Amino acid sequence: MDITLEALLEHQQIVQKNLGKNPKVKNVEYKDGVEKMSVEIIFKDVENESIKPRLGGYSFLPENIDWPLNPNGDKLTLVLSLPTNFLNKTLNLNLPQEHVLSVFTTYKKDDYFLDLITFHGDKEELKNIKNGFTKVLLHEAGDIRNESDYLIPAQEFIFGEELNLDLEAVDDEDLDEIEIYCGSLIGNIPSLLQIENLGLDDYHFCLQIYGGDFPEGFHDLFSLSDSIGYLFINNNYDHDAGVFFTQCT
């Protein structure tokens, strides 16, 4: 699935109309994708079986691939469904065409699970996550499917504006006066990522999702509504598509 320049410009007009001008951000130029910038993501309702890049909805995981379970035997919940055509065009990647990158997480309404999906640089935390408390799968598109106990109402990605996340030129005394972006975004620079050296040298940043951006009833998908989920894609995706974890500031 490709997102055309015309469609992105239309999205931009909608964002400006609905959200107004933000003096802290600049307009996006989509000609060469967003691999050299970070762009805010806002969301709108879409069908659960939509082929568009989205939060939630049904998975396209083929029947010959087992639904992912965490080490406790719990079925994971689909967080993101991302067509590789979209990722390739938007981030200048070289993933297999006509595939889907599916991101799953541990989620329980009534039990504490924050520590199972959180990573702040500790090796044991990363080991937990890679053992299957979250899962990133690259696969061909199968029929729509859901085996989780939960189905998040699907939310389509809409590109907003380019974000200025470069704080290196800002004096320390001025940092307290700056409103740092803490929402959902896609691009090459994350926001509020704690501990820059996470030991993910073989991965590159793809996008982040703010817990409060999930639909009503699922603001606790990352346990806390102000948690942020970070998606990193593996440069050697043949054996390990990526890693997904959360942080809470």
Where are the regions a protein language model picked out?
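Preference for intrinsically disordered or flexible, low-complexity segments
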Residues: D2-T249
